[in-house]
Amino acid sequence: SEGTVNAFRIQGLKLQDYVNAMVKNRPIESLRKPFAVVATQLETGQRTVFTRGNTGQAVRASSSVPGVFEPVRIGRFNYVDGGIVSPVPVDAARQLGADLVIAVDISSKVTGKAPEGMLGIVNQSIMIMGQKLGEQELARADVVIRPRVNAIGPAEFEQKNQAILEGEKAALAALPQIRARIGQLQKVRMAVPV
């Protein structure tokens, strides 16, 4: 209904305003650290990496899950969730110049059970597609952190504290691997003549 669409529009604008307030209305290119936002161009399906422009608007576009939030119009195009074409944007991080890419895999895994009904089949198919895309990107990361959040659905906001706790546990468990990788990078840098 029209009321539902307006509610989603308001939620999206609230996110945009919140992000812009957090960055003091600085555009992406003026942020202190290199930053990029990945979104999907709805008309073409192309991955778009925003490295300039309105920070809040780009984050809103990247967060616009189809069917949950309306697409965000930027310039001539409409944008939706970047996870559709790039679930784990390792390549975007590399393009920014990252020497070490630490990825976090929170993708849903296929359960091994046959889905029920047409909607179940569609959902399972989308999950498989996202999982395969994500695996390709995760393979290009230096370290992958995998919090145990598979039992928590993407819309189960009441379990956010549990999800955060699982993320913290997984990050702490990955620290030795991260430190080892940093050590390897430092050795390579020292060995390269200037």
Regions found by a protein language model. Name each.
Residues 1-194:
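Patatin-like phospholipase
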